[in-house]
Protein backbone atom coordinates (compact mmCIF):
# COMPACT_ATOMS: atom_id res chain seq x y z
CA UNK A 1 0.00 0.00 0.00
CA UNK A 2 1.28 3.46 -0.89
CA UNK A 3 2.20 5.61 2.11
CA UNK A 4 1.22 8.96 0.59
CA UNK A 5 -2.02 9.25 -1.33
CA UNK A 6 -3.11 12.09 -3.60
CA UNK A 7 -6.43 12.74 -5.32
CA UNK A 8 -6.71 15.29 -8.13
CA UNK A 9 -9.64 16.87 -9.96
CA UNK A 10 -9.57 18.51 -13.39
CA UNK A 11 -11.23 21.74 -14.42
CA UNK A 12 -14.20 21.59 -16.74
CA UNK A 13 -17.04 23.90 -15.71
CA UNK A 14 -20.41 22.15 -15.69
CA UNK A 15 -18.62 18.89 -16.51
CA UNK A 16 -17.41 18.94 -12.92
CA UNK A 17 -20.62 17.00 -12.31
CA UNK A 18 -18.94 13.99 -13.92
CA UNK A 19 -15.97 13.91 -11.55
CA UNK A 20 -18.20 14.58 -8.54
CA UNK A 21 -20.56 11.73 -9.38
CA UNK A 22 -17.63 9.39 -10.04
CA UNK A 23 -16.18 10.43 -6.68
CA UNK A 24 -19.49 9.77 -4.93
CA UNK A 25 -19.67 6.26 -6.36
CA UNK A 26 -16.06 5.55 -5.39
CA UNK A 27 -16.54 6.91 -1.87
CA UNK A 28 -19.62 4.74 -1.29
CA UNK A 29 -17.73 1.65 -2.39
CA UNK A 30 -14.55 2.64 -0.52
CA UNK A 31 -15.63 4.27 2.77
CA UNK A 32 -12.06 5.15 3.82
CA UNK A 33 -11.13 6.77 0.50
CA UNK A 34 -11.43 10.37 1.70
CA UNK A 35 -10.01 9.91 5.20
CA UNK A 36 -6.93 8.10 3.88
CA UNK A 37 -6.11 10.72 1.26
CA UNK A 38 -3.27 13.08 2.22
CA UNK A 39 -3.55 15.66 -0.58
CA UNK A 40 -6.51 16.99 -2.54
CA UNK A 41 -5.66 19.09 -5.55
CA UNK A 42 -7.80 20.60 -8.26
CA UNK A 43 -7.99 23.21 -10.95
CA UNK A 44 -10.90 25.54 -11.68
CA UNK A 45 -14.14 23.72 -10.76
CA UNK A 46 -11.88 20.90 -9.57
CA UNK A 47 -10.45 23.27 -6.97
CA UNK A 48 -13.96 23.66 -5.54
CA UNK A 49 -14.17 19.88 -5.13
CA UNK A 50 -10.64 19.56 -3.73
CA UNK A 51 -10.99 22.32 -1.14
CA UNK A 52 -14.47 21.17 -0.15
CA UNK A 53 -13.07 17.72 0.67
CA UNK A 54 -10.02 19.20 2.39
CA UNK A 55 -12.30 21.30 4.61
CA UNK A 56 -14.25 18.25 5.74
CA UNK A 57 -17.25 18.34 3.41
CA UNK A 58 -18.48 14.98 2.13
CA UNK A 59 -18.59 14.05 -1.57
CA UNK A 60 -22.38 13.81 -1.37
CA UNK A 61 -22.76 17.24 0.22
CA UNK A 62 -20.37 18.77 -2.31
CA UNK A 63 -22.23 17.30 -5.29
CA UNK A 64 -25.59 18.42 -3.92
CA UNK A 65 -24.36 21.99 -3.49
CA UNK A 66 -22.80 21.91 -6.95
CA UNK A 67 -26.14 20.94 -8.48
CA UNK A 68 -28.24 23.34 -6.39
CA UNK A 69 -26.07 26.46 -6.27
CA UNK A 70 -23.05 26.26 -8.60
CA UNK A 71 -24.84 25.15 -11.77
CA UNK A 72 -27.37 28.02 -11.78
CA UNK A 73 -24.42 30.42 -12.10
CA UNK A 74 -23.80 28.89 -15.54
CA UNK A 75 -27.41 29.28 -16.69
CA UNK A 76 -27.07 32.85 -18.00
CA UNK A 77 -25.03 33.22 -21.19
CA UNK A 78 -24.36 36.66 -22.60
CA UNK A 79 -24.97 37.34 -26.32
CA UNK A 80 -21.80 36.93 -28.35
CA UNK A 81 -19.95 34.98 -25.66
CA UNK A 82 -17.36 33.59 -25.47
CA UNK A 83 -16.12 34.86 -28.85
CA UNK A 84 -17.12 38.53 -28.83
CA UNK A 85 -18.04 38.98 -25.19
CA UNK A 86 -17.41 37.53 -21.72
CA UNK A 87 -19.77 34.57 -21.79
CA UNK A 88 -20.89 34.31 -18.17
CA UNK A 89 -21.65 36.95 -15.55
CA UNK A 90 -19.27 35.95 -12.77
CA UNK A 91 -21.22 37.34 -9.81
CA UNK A 92 -23.45 34.27 -9.34
CA UNK A 93 -20.48 31.90 -9.26
CA UNK A 94 -18.60 34.13 -6.81
CA UNK A 95 -21.60 34.23 -4.47
CA UNK A 96 -22.14 30.46 -4.65
CA UNK A 97 -18.50 29.66 -3.83
CA UNK A 98 -18.35 32.16 -0.97
CA UNK A 99 -21.58 30.89 0.57
CA UNK A 100 -20.32 27.30 0.73
CA UNK A 101 -17.35 28.05 2.99
CA UNK A 102 -17.06 30.01 6.24
CA UNK A 103 -16.06 33.57 5.35
CA UNK A 104 -12.87 33.41 7.43
CA UNK A 105 -11.75 29.89 6.40
CA UNK A 106 -8.10 30.00 5.31
CA UNK A 107 -5.76 27.45 3.75
CA UNK A 108 -4.03 27.02 7.10
CA UNK A 109 -7.34 25.80 8.58
CA UNK A 110 -7.84 22.91 6.16
CA UNK A 111 -7.65 19.34 7.43
CA UNK A 112 -5.69 18.09 4.43
CA UNK A 113 -2.91 19.33 2.17
CA UNK A 114 -4.03 21.02 -1.05
CA UNK A 115 -2.52 22.19 -4.34
CA UNK A 116 -4.42 24.59 -6.64
CA UNK A 117 -2.95 26.08 -9.85
CA UNK A 118 -3.75 29.57 -11.08
CA UNK A 119 -2.14 32.25 -13.23
CA UNK A 120 -1.41 35.78 -11.99
CA UNK A 121 -1.63 38.42 -14.69
CA UNK A 122 0.84 40.74 -12.99
CA UNK A 123 3.24 40.15 -10.11
CA UNK A 124 4.71 43.36 -8.73
CA UNK A 125 7.57 41.39 -7.19
CA UNK A 126 8.54 39.75 -10.49
CA UNK A 127 7.37 42.60 -12.75
CA UNK A 128 5.68 40.10 -15.07
CA UNK A 129 2.87 37.57 -15.13
CA UNK A 130 3.47 34.20 -13.50
CA UNK A 131 2.00 30.78 -12.71
CA UNK A 132 0.93 30.31 -9.10
CA UNK A 133 0.52 27.05 -7.20
CA UNK A 134 -1.50 27.74 -4.07
CA UNK A 135 -0.77 25.20 -1.33
CA UNK A 136 -0.78 24.74 2.43
CA UNK A 137 2.35 22.66 2.92
CA UNK A 138 4.66 23.88 5.72
CA UNK A 139 6.29 27.19 4.86
CA UNK A 140 3.69 28.13 2.26
CA UNK A 141 3.32 31.88 1.66
CA UNK A 142 -0.39 31.28 1.03
CA UNK A 143 -1.49 29.91 4.41
CA UNK A 144 -3.56 33.00 5.22
CA UNK A 145 -5.37 33.09 1.88
CA UNK A 146 -9.12 32.59 2.05
CA UNK A 147 -10.31 29.27 0.65
CA UNK A 148 -13.03 30.93 -1.43
CA UNK A 149 -10.54 33.38 -2.95
CA UNK A 150 -8.17 30.58 -3.97
CA UNK A 151 -10.99 28.71 -5.72
CA UNK A 152 -12.15 31.83 -7.56
CA UNK A 153 -8.59 32.72 -8.58
CA UNK A 154 -8.31 29.27 -10.16
CA UNK A 155 -11.66 29.54 -11.96
CA UNK A 156 -11.70 32.74 -14.03
CA UNK A 157 -11.46 31.20 -17.50
CA UNK A 158 -10.48 33.77 -20.16
CA UNK A 159 -13.41 34.59 -22.49
CA UNK A 160 -15.85 32.63 -20.33
CA UNK A 161 -15.44 34.55 -17.07
CA UNK A 162 -13.43 37.56 -15.98
CA UNK A 163 -10.21 37.53 -14.02
CA UNK A 164 -10.61 37.46 -10.25
CA UNK A 165 -8.24 39.58 -8.15
CA UNK A 166 -5.81 39.68 -11.11
CA UNK A 167 -5.79 35.87 -11.48
CA UNK A 168 -7.17 33.69 -14.28
CA UNK A 169 -8.10 30.03 -14.57
CA UNK A 170 -5.44 27.52 -13.68
CA UNK A 171 -5.99 25.67 -16.96
CA UNK A 172 -3.41 27.93 -18.59
CA UNK A 173 -0.94 26.22 -16.21
CA UNK A 174 -2.35 22.76 -15.48
CA UNK A 175 -5.85 21.53 -16.27
CA UNK A 176 -4.87 18.35 -14.44
CA UNK A 177 -2.71 19.21 -11.39
CA UNK A 178 -1.36 15.71 -10.79
CA UNK A 179 2.29 16.42 -11.62
CA UNK A 180 2.36 19.53 -9.43
CA UNK A 181 0.91 17.49 -6.58
CA UNK A 182 3.60 14.84 -6.95
CA UNK A 183 6.26 17.56 -6.94
CA UNK A 184 4.94 19.02 -3.68
CA UNK A 185 4.76 15.59 -2.06
CA UNK A 186 8.43 15.01 -2.88
CA UNK A 187 9.72 18.55 -2.38
CA UNK A 188 7.64 19.76 0.57
CA UNK A 189 6.56 16.59 2.40
CA UNK A 190 9.84 14.73 1.69
CA UNK A 191 8.01 11.61 0.53
CA UNK A 192 10.02 9.22 -1.69
CA UNK A 193 8.55 8.92 -5.16
CA UNK A 194 8.05 5.17 -4.79
CA UNK A 195 5.69 5.72 -1.83
CA UNK A 196 3.28 8.05 -3.67
CA UNK A 197 0.01 7.06 -5.37
CA UNK A 198 -2.27 9.37 -7.36
CA UNK A 199 -5.92 8.94 -8.28
CA UNK A 200 -6.62 11.52 -10.99
CA UNK A 201 -10.30 12.15 -11.82
CA UNK A 202 -11.13 14.02 -15.02
CA UNK A 203 -14.20 15.76 -16.39
CA UNK A 204 -14.52 13.56 -19.45
CA UNK A 205 -12.42 12.81 -22.50
CA UNK A 206 -14.12 14.36 -25.53
CA UNK A 207 -13.24 13.48 -29.15
CA UNK A 208 -12.06 17.02 -29.95
CA UNK A 209 -10.02 17.18 -33.13
CA UNK A 210 -8.86 19.44 -35.96
CA UNK A 211 -8.41 17.73 -39.30
CA UNK A 212 -8.27 20.59 -41.76
CA UNK A 213 -5.55 22.50 -43.57
CA UNK A 214 -4.46 25.36 -41.31
CA UNK A 215 -2.23 27.13 -43.84
CA UNK A 216 -2.72 30.87 -43.70
CA UNK A 217 -4.47 30.88 -40.34
CA UNK A 218 -3.76 33.77 -38.00
CA UNK A 219 -5.04 34.24 -34.49
CA UNK A 220 -7.95 36.27 -35.88
CA UNK A 221 -9.13 37.37 -39.30
CA UNK A 222 -9.91 40.95 -40.23
CA UNK A 223 -13.46 39.82 -40.90
CA UNK A 224 -13.82 38.65 -37.31
CA UNK A 225 -13.79 42.24 -36.08
CA UNK A 226 -17.36 43.53 -35.95
CA UNK A 227 -18.51 40.93 -38.49
CA UNK A 228 -21.62 41.50 -40.54
CA UNK A 229 -22.14 37.87 -41.49
CA UNK A 230 -21.07 35.23 -38.96
CA UNK A 231 -21.73 32.41 -41.41
CA UNK A 232 -18.98 33.47 -43.80
CA UNK A 233 -16.10 34.07 -41.39
CA UNK A 234 -12.79 32.50 -42.45
CA UNK A 235 -11.34 30.00 -39.96
CA UNK A 236 -8.44 30.94 -37.69
CA UNK A 237 -6.72 29.85 -34.49
CA UNK A 238 -8.75 32.27 -32.39
CA UNK A 239 -12.25 31.12 -33.30
CA UNK A 240 -13.76 28.49 -35.58
CA UNK A 241 -17.40 29.30 -36.21
CA UNK A 242 -17.92 27.01 -39.22
CA UNK A 243 -17.02 23.93 -37.21
CA UNK A 244 -18.18 20.35 -37.11
CA UNK A 245 -19.49 18.95 -33.78
CA UNK A 246 -16.06 17.63 -32.72
CA UNK A 247 -14.02 20.66 -33.77
CA UNK A 248 -13.10 23.30 -31.17
CA UNK A 249 -14.86 26.66 -31.11
CA UNK A 250 -11.71 28.35 -29.73
CA UNK A 251 -8.87 26.26 -31.19
CA UNK A 252 -5.92 27.93 -29.48
CA UNK A 253 -7.45 28.15 -26.00
CA UNK A 254 -8.85 24.63 -26.19
CA UNK A 255 -5.50 23.22 -27.35
CA UNK A 256 -3.85 24.79 -24.31
CA UNK A 257 -6.42 23.35 -21.91
CA UNK A 258 -6.74 19.93 -23.52
CA UNK A 259 -3.11 19.49 -24.42
CA UNK A 260 -1.68 20.24 -21.00
CA UNK A 261 -4.23 17.92 -19.39
CA UNK A 262 -3.06 14.98 -21.49
CA UNK A 263 0.56 16.02 -20.93
CA UNK A 264 0.15 16.03 -17.15
CA UNK A 265 -1.29 12.51 -17.22
CA UNK A 266 1.57 11.27 -19.40
CA UNK A 267 4.24 12.73 -17.12
CA UNK A 268 2.55 11.55 -13.91
CA UNK A 269 2.14 8.04 -15.30
CA UNK A 270 5.82 7.94 -16.24
CA UNK A 271 6.83 9.11 -12.76
CA UNK A 272 4.64 6.69 -10.81
CA UNK A 273 3.93 3.78 -13.14
CA UNK A 274 1.08 1.65 -11.82
CA UNK A 275 0.74 3.92 -8.77
CA UNK A 276 -0.97 6.49 -11.03
CA UNK A 277 -4.56 5.93 -12.12
CA UNK A 278 -6.49 8.17 -14.47
CA UNK A 279 -10.30 7.98 -14.32
CA UNK A 280 -11.64 10.01 -17.24
CA UNK A 281 -14.52 8.38 -19.17
CA UNK A 282 -15.10 9.11 -22.82
CA UNK A 283 -17.92 11.62 -23.35
CA UNK A 284 -19.50 13.42 -26.32
CA UNK A 285 -18.26 16.93 -27.04
CA UNK A 286 -20.42 18.54 -24.37
CA UNK A 287 -20.34 22.24 -23.53
CA UNK A 288 -18.44 23.13 -20.35
CA UNK A 289 -20.80 26.03 -19.67
CA UNK A 290 -24.26 24.54 -20.27
CA UNK A 291 -26.08 23.12 -17.22
CA UNK A 292 -28.41 21.21 -19.56
CA UNK A 293 -25.68 18.61 -20.21
CA UNK A 294 -25.47 17.58 -16.54
CA UNK A 295 -28.15 14.83 -16.59
CA UNK A 296 -26.34 13.13 -19.48
CA UNK A 297 -23.01 13.57 -17.70
CA UNK A 298 -24.37 12.02 -14.51
CA UNK A 299 -25.71 9.07 -16.51
CA UNK A 300 -22.27 8.50 -18.04
CA UNK A 301 -20.70 8.60 -14.58
CA UNK A 302 -23.24 6.07 -13.31
CA UNK A 303 -22.54 3.70 -16.20
CA UNK A 304 -18.75 3.94 -15.97
CA UNK A 305 -17.06 0.69 -14.97
CA UNK A 306 -15.30 1.43 -11.69
CA UNK A 307 -13.76 -2.00 -11.14
CA UNK A 308 -10.25 -0.97 -12.30
CA UNK A 309 -10.41 2.17 -10.13
CA UNK A 310 -11.63 0.18 -7.12
CA UNK A 311 -8.79 -2.31 -7.55
CA UNK A 312 -6.31 0.57 -7.67
CA UNK A 313 -7.83 2.11 -4.53
CA UNK A 314 -7.82 -1.19 -2.64
CA UNK A 315 -4.16 -1.70 -3.50
CA UNK A 316 -3.00 1.83 -2.66
CA UNK A 317 -5.54 3.17 -0.14
CA UNK A 318 -6.03 -0.06 1.74
CA UNK A 319 -8.92 -2.46 2.17
CA UNK A 320 -12.48 -1.31 2.65
Curated annotation (Swiss-Prot):
Its EC number is 3.1.1.-. GO terms for biological process: lipid catabolic process; sporulation resulting in formation of a cellular spore. A motif (GXSXG) lies at residues 42-46. The active site is at residues 44, 169. It is found in: Spore coat. Residues 7-182 form the PNPLA domain. Keywords: Hydrolase, Lipid degradation, Lipid metabolism, Sporulation. A motif (GXGXXG) lies at residues 11-16. Gene3D superfamilies: Cytosolic phospholipase A2 catalytic domain (3.40.1090.10). One of its GO terms (molecular function) is hydrolase activity. PANTHER family: INTRACELLLAR PHOSPHOLIPASE A FAMILY, PHOSPHOLIPASE A2. This is Putative sporulation hydrolase CotR. It comes from Bacillus subtilis (strain 168). The gene is cotR.
